[in-house]
Amino acid sequence: QDTYLNAKKYIEFYLVVDNGMFXKYSXXFTV
């Protein structure tokens, strides 16, 4: 299922961001 794979990718990306990488990119991105 492509939808499941896409969701998994998105979730994994979100987890990486939530792991602290967000602080590294927060300077580049405005949230």
Swiss-Prot record:
Cofactor: Zn(2+)
Peptidase M12B domain: residues covered: 9-31
Post-translational modification: Contains 9 disulfide bonds.
Tissue: Expressed by the venom gland.
Record's cofactor remark: Binds 1 zinc ion per subunit.
An annotated GO BP: proteolysis
Record localization: Secreted
Record EC number: 3.4.24.-
Residues annotated as binding Ca(2+): 12
Source domain of life: Eukaryota
Regulation affecting activity: Inhibited by 1,10-phenanthroline.
Major subcellular site: secreted
GO molecular function: metal ion binding; metallopeptidase activity; toxin activity
Sorted UniProt keywords: Calcium, Cell adhesion impairing toxin, Disulfide bond, Fibrinogenolytic toxin, Hemorrhagic toxin, Hemostasis impairing toxin, Hydrolase, Metal-binding, Metalloprotease, Myotoxin, Protease, Pyrrolidone carboxylic acid, Secreted, Toxin, Zinc
GO cellular component, one term: extracellular region
Residues that bear Pyrrolidone carboxylic acid: 1
General function of this protein: Snake venom zinc metalloprotease that has potent hemorrhagic activity, fibrinogenolytic activity on the alpha-subunit of human fibrinogen (FGA) in vitro and provokes necrosis in skin, muscle and lung tissues. May contribute to local edema and ecchymosis induced by venom. Hydrolyzes model substrate (beta-chain of insulin) at Ala(14)-Leu(15).
Family per record: Belongs to the venom metalloproteinase (M12B) family. P-III subfamily. P-IIIa sub-subfamily.
Subunit details: Monomer.
Name of the protein: Zinc metalloproteinase alsophinase
